[in-house]
């Protein structure tokens, strides 16, 4: 299963908890600029909330974001599990 960058970030925040943009970018394998743009989109979608502690931006899942991230992780793990069994 291929995840979009948005989906990948949601799962990263689910697994690791609140993180700075730079750490999310590193874990997702994307640039900090791309990460910032994606974080803004996730914020606009109501899936994450950000706390600004100068000069840092700490991001965490909202309740809705948590529900979606859990479901995405479950689906991706099921797909991977089924793929491995068929090899």
Question: Which stretches of residues belong to each language-model region?
Answer:
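Alpha-helix N-cap/helix-initiation sites
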Residues: 2-3, 32, 54
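Short amphipathic alpha-helical interface segments
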Residues: 2-18
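A broad, structural micro-motif
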Residues: 19, 59-61
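Short acidic, hydrophobic short linear motifs in intrinsically disordered regions
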Residues: 19-27
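Short amphipathic alpha-helical interaction segments
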Residues: 29-44
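Short, Lys/Arg-rich nucleic-acid/phosphate-binding segment
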Residues: 52-58
